[in-house]
Amino acid sequence: MKVYLVVVDTLADWEIGYLTAELHSRRFFADPSKDFQLLKAGVSRDAVTSMGGVTHTPDLAIDDIQMGDNDLLLLPGADIWESAQARPALELARNALDHGHQVAAICGATVGLASIGALNTRRHTSNDLGFLKASCPDYRGEHMYRKEPAVRGDNLVTATGLAPLEFSYEVLKMLKVWKPETAKAWYRLHKTRQERWYHELVASMSDTPAVLS
């Protein structure tokens, strides 16, 4: 399994922080030995700078991505999603969705998907429905819009930029790399900050391995 994180200038660090930390560390994986890679993909192999000033050097170019059955294309928020620079990533995302591959997009990346009509027939959310309708001429997906922090469909997760925790939770469930009880405890711990969920998270790691359904 590979997760391809699209890295671009102005990438919104906080929107993917929970998710990339857990995927890279594998600390709560049901099977830590699982064949898994988190790869950074750029428009080119040139380094980019995130909104927080962090430099990212892509492992490969977007044009070189070959999506496998269980792979995920991860699109973080950034200021570039309505520009020509974003087109290669958006076209890859649309093609991936059409072929049943997994895609996750948050904040501005959802606007990019809406702008090419990729959300018209798929359940989704974004920062604001009115903005999608006003700024994306090819958007016809109002009937599929859900006013929720994050929405998971068959092979697509979308989220508002204000919900990085919910976004991460839905993506991790879609990838099925954690046990259900691990995912629940992890999410509730971060959401409520209650001690009981820390103990449940620890306890979940001592049980027989299972995967999310």
Predicted features, each with a name:
Residues 52-59:
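Short gly/ser/thr-rich secondary-structure transition/capping motifs
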Residues 2-6, 10-12, 18, 25-44, ...:
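Active-site-adjacent pocket-lining segments in enzyme domains
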